[in-house]
């Protein structure tokens, strides 16, 4: 081949190799950056007054007085909006108005009885009231604007009649007045349409500001507060201001989405100014400000992760991994020390090494199956999925990593250390414990931290052996109880727990509610990644210090 | 003490410098030390043997819970069961007449694994070449942590990424009818297998030694020719081991494929259409285990799937073990 | 010296973790296992209970079958299930001296959903069955646009799948090209993002991002499901071992759905309370 071609190929090859490394770094960034971007919004976000209300009521955080003042301010700003909404709703819901008219008529009858009106006058008044009621009902039920207005005028003509003063019928006149106001502005025939749209508007207002004044408290916490974050408020605001409909684009073609402005929907009615008011005054209505919600890592969740944090999950993961380390570290380090220092070179030891390598290659789901079949089903002392079974499974998972890392670290200890120790008269065991292990400690520690991060991140082994989606934080009792009754400690280990790894899976595919709060989903995954990353960076730092120490530079 | 040395009893060796006792005691003199030494070694051996015990127990339990699936009475029905398991593509465990055909699951696992390797092996080998031969020391120090972080990210985080970020992207930009498919799973599995492939192949290439490289340069080869024609073939066993270890990682992965592969139990047709959903063995076990009552046929069938997985990864392990022992030989200067 | 310090630090951390974990006294405990469909209601009931009575409730959502198996093994107090017990399960329970009692806490309807841009508004049960068996492959055969149908089903271990399989497909096998997802939110997300998709979800997952189809002329609403008029309506069960002892925590949980609060929670979660007809 010609020299130039060969040199070109050489350059191309080098370039390809460099590009591949860049691609790998790029992949890492592509995977991590969106997670962190969206996950951090669970901790750093723009909160609203509703969030502060929530924090005060569930965790009692925040300055009482300042909060009260703020709440009063927002309530004052919201009152006109609620009034407009209430007015319009009253005037549009004809079914309930009909019921009220009938109610008022009955009450009027009782009122007359109460005032001991003589019988013939009684019948007379009642007949007149009945007329008014029927006219009112005719007005409410008619679809023809002229008939409606005519009937309403007839009703309101009776308003001046002194016999109805201070009687329940006054209320009927108020209703008639309100309906007249509404009826003048809307197309009466399309009443039901207005009603549906009004329901959507009311739902949007509830999503923004919480339950309307005078409404019963909804059972679920997520409905008891309005929008707690500005991004959720923006979404609700969009629903408030725009309606969407799917209209046909022609036969046999998919429908297309059309956005209809709600201002147009309610044009000319009493409700129209509401939209402008909400949109322009959103700052006063919700009082957004920036917040660093670091308690996210401590709080428990409220209402299926809609609010709250991931505290118990972090605690569960830590408990599982630390317990797994308690089992795995002694076994692993002792095994590694034995394999390096004491083991003869026969086939038993080859078998052992082969088994350790096999353990490293077993798929994690098979660990889960084994954990289920052995620790949960066969060992009757445990008998059910719990922290103990899950930690034992995780410890077997971590064992090969610790053995490998420790073996390498112990091998790397220079032979001169051992020779010097032996020369000073120490036995082999003494040498191992006092000289070799401390010298190999950084490497062993790196191995421990790496297996810790692996155990923290694994989901499949703990799926059937001890993790739950919702449950109490395991109760270990207090130290005083342990002294009195050591068995209670063991009892604490027999409870299942939540964990970050399983929680991330559950929240991604679980409840419908989690879909409404993507920041919570990303937040949990980000917490898991952060935990693992912190552990790994610690391992890297320790290892670089170790290489300096052992190499001397 | 020097005076004591002069008064040592008969039978003990005289040391140059006086000690209160001889350095090496016979068992009869120091029974306790002798016994405790050997006992200690025995205990240590037993502790080390727990790993062996663990492996044996794993195999025992998985096999024990799979046998009831095959052995339902007669040998003929057992053989029929085996045939159905490996040759039938229909996995309908809760139908009125259950069918446990795992062929689609096995093919699904292999499909995403090979897809992952197709992406990961060239990328990984090139990166390994770069890191072992071309990169300056400082760059290598930076790249190593990057690769370790890539290896450390939990699989559920990758699965989350696959479902929430990659799947919509695939759907909008590549126009697939579904974003959770074989391609999605293969891409993520490739990312997960990369660190293994890079580190093992880099080790293998460094173990070759400078002499071979210098000889090649001395004959006038360019760097590319040296790498492609000399180093890679010389390290072929290590590289093969790297590929096999990456394959083991990819085939054993559960959470990513459970969330991202679509879980459709079928063989893609046509076979090269990666935009179709498939289901792997690991996802079947993880997904079905929660629903199955203990000790039902479905339960045993799932353990059988687990056994297939275990046997497969075990054999891959054995082969890569053997290949890795070759680079040990290279390191010590053999071949 | 340093080693002792490090060891002491570990012990302190461990003790600290455990005391943070369990500083409370012994509380009454309840264990629920079972269906992912009934799970959200169980969660919400549990949360309301914990707030009122201060007990501790554990909820595991692994699937209807596993919940019933846990009840039989005695590992849980209440099993949540989105389907009734199968005959083999019932027999196994009785053999193990467990006599399951069903409490129906809500009704659910399995709604067939498509993307809102799909012009198709209703289908018959037979057509839906044909779609899932692979006989109909393109929307234009049903009066829609020319798009291939992407059929999505819940995986075979779910109670929702079983109900759909029984009532719509009449126990026939689905086509091999049907895609399986693990849970309702995934099915919802798939339909939301794919114009040609069809899937089935519970009533609580209907929102403005998907469109529910009329099946055999009946729209899935609270009334039609509660009356059983809609084709795929099903009750949601809580199973206990025998009728729970009056006054126990289990009993209170099982009758919680009768209270106003329980009913409003059921409706807020998107299910149909029994009294809706």
In which residue ranges do the predicted regions lie?
Chain C
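Bacterial N-terminal signal peptides
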Residues: 8-16
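Exported/periplasmic ABC-transporter solute-binding proteins
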Residues: 20-277
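Positively charged n-region of N-terminal signal peptides that target proteins for export
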Residues: 1-4
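Short amphipathic alpha-helical "recognition" segments used for binding
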Residues: 6-7, 22
